């Protein structure tokens, strides 16, 4: 296992395991410690657990999504599979579009190409007032805002109370996110719309959804492009954090799909 962070290398990336390179990217308000429960099952891969800029142990990086992706690309191996949860899925999707030769497979978990609801297009997503509420609360009470967001992620799951506790315990093992990075992330969730660019993704693409997800409604999946290289898995009882609430079902979707990248 090794981890790196320095003045020249502001991203904290923890590398564990041996095998094909797999990059794993967390969502808003948390850090890569949320994936700790998956370490053992992913040990046949060389997994790079990334703290996004300003989250966990990574230093903030000013700029937009492209700036973040450039920093990731410069510090991660080429020819890797990229997996992203929630906001991390948006990051991984944009990276697969912008750097197709670097990314040989894409996995999005409870993620949308456009998180914001667009009423005029009947596009399902997060109501605008919810994100603006989080933005306002950030300035008042950072820890409470993070905790409230974790609660929303588990909402709908039968084990919501336990899920929230597990997420909170994992996330709080590292420093709270940088306030500016949280605002950057909210802006990305608010503004980015990749729907018209999805047809350029030619890599094998696994999309894992939670039917009870309160942030990425189940109605998003039928509106997504389909093709022979795309696999959709809808977990019937999962909410926004399926790898926490339904780890075995999540791994049953993920691990067989990953075997195509083994030599």
Swiss-Prot record:
Claim: Secreted is one of the keywords in the record: no
Protein name in UniProt: Pimeloyl-[acyl-carrier protein] methyl ester esterase
Lineage start: Bacteria, Pseudomonadati, Pseudomonadota, Gammaproteobacteria, Alteromonadales
Function of the protein: The physiological role of BioH is to remove the methyl group introduced by BioC when the pimeloyl moiety is complete. It allows to synthesize pimeloyl-ACP via the fatty acid synthetic pathway through the hydrolysis of the ester bonds of pimeloyl-ACP esters.
Active-site annotation: 86, 213, 240
Transmembrane segments: none
Cellular compartments annotated: Cytoplasm
Catalytic activity: 6-carboxyhexanoyl-[ACP] methyl ester + H2O = 6-carboxyhexanoyl-[ACP] + methanol + H(+)
Gene Ontology annotations of biological process type: biotin biosynthetic process
Quaternary structure (record): Monomer.
Keywords noted in UniProt: Biotin biosynthesis, Cytoplasm, Hydrolase, Serine esterase
Annotated InterPro entries: AB_hydrolase_1 (IPR000073), AB_hydrolase_fold (IPR029058), AB_hydrolase_sf (IPR050266), BioH (IPR010076)
Documented EC number(s): 3.1.1.85
Keyword rRNA-binding: no
């Amino acid at each position: 296992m090794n981890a790196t962070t320095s003045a020249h290398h502001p991203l904290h990336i923890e590398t564990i395991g041996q095998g094909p390179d797999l990059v794993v990217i967390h969502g808003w308000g948390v850090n890569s410690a949320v994936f700790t429960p998956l370490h053992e099952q992913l040990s046949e891969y060389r997994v790079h657990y990334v703290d996004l800029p300003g989250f966990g142990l990574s230093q903030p990086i000013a700029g937009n999504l492209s700036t973040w992706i450039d920093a990731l690309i410069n510090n991660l191996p080429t020819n890797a599979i990229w997996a992203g949860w929630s906001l991390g899925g948006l990051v991984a999707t944009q990276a697969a579009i912008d750097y197709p030769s670097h990314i040989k497979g894409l996995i999005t978990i409870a993620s949308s190409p456009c998180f914001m609801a667009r009423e005029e297009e009947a596009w399902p997503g997060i109501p605008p007032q919810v994100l603006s509420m989080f933005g306002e609360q950030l300035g008042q009470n950072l820890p409470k805002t993070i905790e409230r967001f974790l609660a929303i992620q588990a909402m709908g799951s039968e084990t919501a109370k336990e899920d929230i506790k597990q997420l909170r315990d994992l996330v709080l093992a590292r420093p709270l996110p940088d306030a500016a990075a949280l605002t950057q992330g909210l802006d990305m969730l608010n503004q980015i719309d990749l729907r018209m660019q999805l047809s350029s993704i030619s890599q094998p693409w696994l999309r894992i959804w939670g039917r009870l997800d309160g942030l990425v409604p189940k109605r998003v999946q039928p509106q997504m492009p389909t093709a022979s290289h795309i696999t959709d898995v809808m977990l019937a009882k999962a909410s926004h954090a399926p790898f926490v609430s339904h780890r075995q079902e999540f791994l049953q979707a993920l691990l067989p799909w990953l075997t195509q990248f083994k030599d």
